């Protein structure tokens, strides 16, 4: 299998895109530790990964807790002897028009969607450098490039992740570590299912392919970047959005 003997951490893996990423990487042979914020979420991840055997499982982690994040990565490295792939997928939204957005709504999104990505990436650098190889894959968003009303906090965080990705790629490329982004467009998840028919119709008009993407579309792109097929790709963003945004 492509990712046989690979140790992978996927944050925010209890549902949606994160769940599909964890399942896809396990299907490719990796040992996957997927994180959730609750015990029930972690148990759901373990159940989803059970069919692939091995030691793949769910784990509880609050990515905004700096000490817990560092301890979690240290624990994975000690248990398995290393860490090959980190997928920073965990994220939240607190949408609000800018003139009404409170500081705590802005800060919460930055803390989860940007600061936590930096902390976890920093935590994996030492073991990856020691192994002289690794993959850091960050899930950003189409709105980091296109913008979106009511999402100044979310767009700022995701654009920050894209910039940080490029900086890290230049910083650690000589150690054999690649750092890339996947930028999903509108994906068929709980969030898009909550939209009304008028909102859905308006969004579909902006997408040349005429449909929302599937979580599996994002998982396939992550699987590619995690594999040896992407060994010469770093510092880039792969847009998976049906043509909604083109660069």
Predicted regions and their residues:
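Conserved glycine-rich cofactor-binding loop
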Residues: 7, 14-15
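Substrate-binding pocket helix/loop in short-chain dehydrogenase/reductase
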Residues: 97-98, 102-110, 192, 203
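Active-site helix of classical SDR
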Residues: 121, 157, 165
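Alpha-helical segment proximal to the catalytic Tyr-Lys
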Residues: 126, 170-174, 231
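Short, small/polar-rich loop/turn modules that mediate ligand/substrate recognition or access, typified
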Residues: 173, 178, 233-235, 241
């Amino acid at each position: 299998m492509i990712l046989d003997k690979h140790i992978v951490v996927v944050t925010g893996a209890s549902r949606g895109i994160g769940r599909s990423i964890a399942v896809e990487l396990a299907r490719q042979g990796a040992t996957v530790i997927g994180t959730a914020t609750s015990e029930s979420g972690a148990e759901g991840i373990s159940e989803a990964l059970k069919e692939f055997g091995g030691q793949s499982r769910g784990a509880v982690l609050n990515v905004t807790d700096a000490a817990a994040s560092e301890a979690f990565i240290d624990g994975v490295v000690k248990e398995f002897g290393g860490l090959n792939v980190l997928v920073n997928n965990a994220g939240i939204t607190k949408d609000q028009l800018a003139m009404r957005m409170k500081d705590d709504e802005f800060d919460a999104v930055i803390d989860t969607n940007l600061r936590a990505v930096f902390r976890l990436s920093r935590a994996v650098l030492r073991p990856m450098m020691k192994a002289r190889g690794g993959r850091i894959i960050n899930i950003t968003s189409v709105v980091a490039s296109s913008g979106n009303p009511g999402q100044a906090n979310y767009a700022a965080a995701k654009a920050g992740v894209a910039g940080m990705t490029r900086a890290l790629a230049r910083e650690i490329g000589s150690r054999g570590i690649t750092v890339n982004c996947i930028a999903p467009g509108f994906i068929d998840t709980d969030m898009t299912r909550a939209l009304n028919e008028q909102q859905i119709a308006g969004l579909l008009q902006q997408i040349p392919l005429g449909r929302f993407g599937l979580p599996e579309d994002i998982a396939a792109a992550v699987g590619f970047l995690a594999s040896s097929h992407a060994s010469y790709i770093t510092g880039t963003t792969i847009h998976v959005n049906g043509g909604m945004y083109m660069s």
